C-alpha cells in the first residue's frame, strides 16, 4: 500500500516506491511520463510533487501517496480515486467532474476554484481542508 521508506537521493523529501529504493521521479530505471500514461496508477508515491496541467481523466488511482504536492489545472474528470493520500496538497483550478472518490485523505489540503460536479465522494477525509470558490454541485 504505502511505502514509508525515503528516496535514496539524500536531498529528496519524497518516499520510495514499493518496487525501488528511489521515488518515481529519481528512479534511474523509470521515466515518469510512461508511468503517468498508464490508465491505472497503483501504489504510486510522488510526495512533494509539482503537477501542472496533466490529464488524469478516466484513470484509476489506487493506494497512492501524493501528500504535500501541488496540482494546478489538472483534469481528474471521470477518474476513480480509491484509498489514496493527498494530505496537505494544493489544488488550484482542478476539475474532478463525474469522478468517484472513496477512502481518500485530503486532510489539510487547499482547494481553490476546483470543480466537483456530479462526483461521488464517500468515506473521504477533508479535515482541516480549505475549500474556496469551488463547485460541488450535482
Question: In which residue ranges do the predicted regions lie?
Answer:
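Tandem repeat scaffolds
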Residues: 1-20, 28-138
Amino acid at each position: 500500500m504505502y511505502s514509508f521508506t525515503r528516496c535514496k537521493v539524500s536531498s529528496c523529501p519524497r518516499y520510495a516506491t514499493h518496487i525501488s529504493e528511489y521515488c518515481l521521479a529519481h528512479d534511474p530505471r523509470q521515466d515518469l511520463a510512461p508511468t503517468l500514461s498508464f490508465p491505472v496508477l497503483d501504489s504510486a508515491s510522488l510526495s512533494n510533487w509539482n503537477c501542472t496541467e496533466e490529464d488524469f481523466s478516466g484513470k484509476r488511482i489506487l493506494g497512492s501517496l501524493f501528500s504535500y504536492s501541488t496540482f494546478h489545472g489538472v483534469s481528474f474528470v471521470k477518474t476513480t480515486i480509491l484509498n489514496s493520500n493527498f494530505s496537505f496538497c494544493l489544488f488550484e483550478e482542478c476539475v474532478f467532474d463525474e469522478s468517484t472518490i472513496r477512502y481518500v485523505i485530503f486532510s489539510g489540503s487547499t482547494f481553490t476554484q476546483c470543480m466537483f460536479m456530479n462526483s461521488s465522494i464517500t468515506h473521504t477525509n477533508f479535515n482541516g481542508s480549505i475549500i474556496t470558490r469551488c463547485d460541488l454541485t450535482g
